[in-house]
Amino acid sequence: MPKTEEHDRLAEARAGREWHRWGPYLSERSWGTVREDYSANGAAWNFLTHDMARSKAYRWGEDGLAGICDRFQVLCFSLALWNGRDPILKERPFGLIPSEGNHGEDLKEYYFYVDSTPTHSYMKYLYKYPQAEYPYCRLVEENARRGGQGPEFELLDTRIFDEDRYFDVFVEYAKADTDDLCIRIEAFNRGPEAAELHLLPHLWFRNVWAWGENRRREPVIQPGTAADGYVTLVADDTDAEGLDNLPFKYSVGRRRLYGEADGHPLFTDNESNFQRLYGPAADDGRKYVKDAFHRHVVNGEATVNPAARGTKSCLHYRRMVAPGGSTVIRLRLTAASLAAPLVDVDALVDRRRHEADRFYAQIHPKGASEDERRVQRQAFAGLMWSKQNYIFDVDKWLDGDNTKLPPPVSRREIRNKHWRHLNSMRVLSMPDKWEYPWFAAWDLAFHTVAIALIDPDFAKEQLWFMLFEQFQHPNGQIPAYEWEFSDLNPPVHPWAVWRVYSMDRIRSGTADRAFLERCFHKLLINFAWWINKVDSQGNNVFEGGFLGLDNITLFDRSEKLPGGAILEQSDATGWMGLFCLNMMRIALELAKENRTYEGLATKFFQHYIYIGAAMKHMGGRGYDLWDEEDGFFYDVLRYPDGHFEKLRVRSMVGLIPLFAVERLEAKWIAQFAEFTGNLNWFLENRQDVVRHCVNRISGSAGETLALTIVGPRQIERMLQRLCDPDEFLSDYGLRSLSRAHRDAPFVLGGNRVSYEPGEADCKIKGGNSNWRGPIWFPTAFLMIESLRKLAKAYGDDMAIVDRAGRRWTIGEIARTHAERLIAVFVRDASGRRPEYGSIEKFQTDPYWRDYLTFHEYFHGDTGAGLGASHQTGWTGLVASLIDEWRAH
């Protein structure tokens, strides 16, 4: 593959050059997060609201529009806007909190991650800013009025974009060098009349000085040189005290923000406005505070520092934009003192844009259409823009910074008290920087698979961070997410480690054994934790826990069940089967150079066999998770007195045992003498358990062992449902719940599960997600991968005939599901994108129709995007699907 300029930068970064020092690491929402919650009751969304955010200094991380910062978030840059009508300066995206949204928290803005290279040498972002007053109150009131049953009331529904009275604000970043960033902001007036727009590029320091018993020395921003054609802001932390949770001295030094000459510099401090937040009696004597620019620009108050210095600054531009016209602002953030800093900004932006084109031309598969390339590139852009500084010291957060002003003691018992070791200053891949601006371990595993296509080093780094001592618990558990690090998530980390390692080895030609080995050692600890914690009966059947599929069952699986009942879960057991197979595969890879690992490969093979057998026999209790009558796996509710109840819900839970699939070719494993010997002994002497999980397939190339928790007949019966449009096969991929439950809901003890293809009617885990019918990319992706393994093992010998009489091979089933997932985003024959449903603005308007959002999940019947609108995280897997299914 020909190398491009971006490939060269990635190689330089691997060698130590800091191309990643600056990036889109600024969050889009720090208010309402657990990190900023110091309440007595753990009500994070109410402790620091959107309305308070403009006035309160954040403790653990900043936010903004189209923002960037350095990798430790010392110095931040973002854009604020004002249309002359809004009641507040638009400094950060707005959305509803869970108690306001009729389906949980919900972003109410339109912005798009248009482009980004892996080193962020080029980035592009689009924000659509209405010219009329933003309807904050109406959005809150109407969504509250609708309740949980009605559709969400969106910003477009307010008709604020009628007659195209809005600005398209594009922000482009281009790195001239590692510490030299060119910034180009262009705002287009799409409306029929001239309109004024205030643009305020912000430059500020994160507040790290105000939290302890004694204030630390502060950095400063002051005016710099003003010459023909530009003004300057100079930020300097040289004399400030450094970050206290890094083992080394770090500063950004002296930085200059050059801007066009009509920008008026404004200065204040990144300090809380105590009087506004807590009343007049709370005055701490500080005159220049965080919300000064809002009050100055919107209300005309004299709130900025006339001495022209502070820790927060901006350049205030006022531009009148003609109808159909645009205005451009050029800026440059650099360590260098430049005589003509803005002269070559346009040329540098253009150059980096063309380099990005060349880079992605090498990434896109040959068989991808122009529209599929657009989808893939914007998916990569979303993954890159979703990087965020995740700054959180749980020990300090629990106890408070200032011993003289400690937070309420009660909060120590609410969440995360067992995670005091967790201390992050890392740049992490977020699920969604507004809706989920915190890492989620199982989400992150899926992110890395798509990211590895363009930046395998970053993908490997992300996987290792979750296993690093400052994240992984000493007992072996991988932290789930900040709302409760102790929650259980599906153990997909070994799968991601193995897959990213394999992708990197194939593409680079070099096997990163060191990465694989160190991850394997930490995953051994994690496996031991799962065995000791979650298999409470020691019968290789796993129970309890959240496991990521929020509302898929009758109960909230994070909570204990009444009466001492235990939920024995087919998905938990299936996930553990997948865990075992991936660990076996990694151990065999490591055994190529160190035969010691063959014994561990045997261990995980045997664990897998016992898990598979247990799903069939449940320790001789007279029931199992497989239901022969229905041909499906069901959860079992087991009571203390020994009686049990099958939960006959046909959902993703019952399909997950299909994920636990691997194939071993006899010729390939022959190189591992000890493993092969142990394997053969097991096959010959433990037929009672092996016959359920190992199928020998003879072919022209020799014998293949198909390792499957489900036997061939069971596979065929499950495949029937995967091909049935009245069950799991949607026009847009794999449904999470069978459509059969539309007419036949499952009811038990007043709880009910029915087919809900759109938003959820219940509010388990906040209510903003739904696993009772919609399509989810991560589980659909794993299903496709499992089907491909089965197809390679069985070939065309295993096939099913659907109810319509069509014959399906396993490979055809896999391709059908993959094609339908890709079709969610790609224009159909009529030019419409299913993900945008019936929203005509997105379907037909030339300024909207080619800007994509990668929603959290998708309607089970229409493919319309639902949930978080920027969860490029795991929905970015569409980039992997395009890569794999358009290779030729």
Residue locations for each model-derived region?
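Acidic, mature catalytic/reactive cores of soluble proteins
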Residues: 1-59, 65-67, 72-73, 80-888
